[in-house]
Amino acid sequence: MSGPSAAYYNNNVDALVHTGPCELIGVVLTDADAASLAIHDCTSSPAAGNKVLEVQVTTTILTQVVMLPTPITLKAGLYVDVGTAIAGGSYCIIWR
């Protein structure tokens, strides 16, 4: 195997996780309040046209785990855009 089978990235704010082609495998989002994030296939300036996945939590559903049955192929890069602020929690992006 030439590289890692998966990489993990943890944060709670907007971030460019990876530049260049990759595959999104999963997302975990947790917070004690309402929060949301979107994954975009870009390296900056996320827009509706390059959004590939959106994940949300609420005050009654504190954690969302999305493990994709088939990875989403990203060509430009993997950018996380936090929509509703993540107050006390965090997200974890799983990619390769």
Kindly give the residue locations of the regions a language model identified.
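Surface-exposed, low-hydrophobicity beta-strand/loop segments enriched in small/polar/acidic residues
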Residues: 1-96
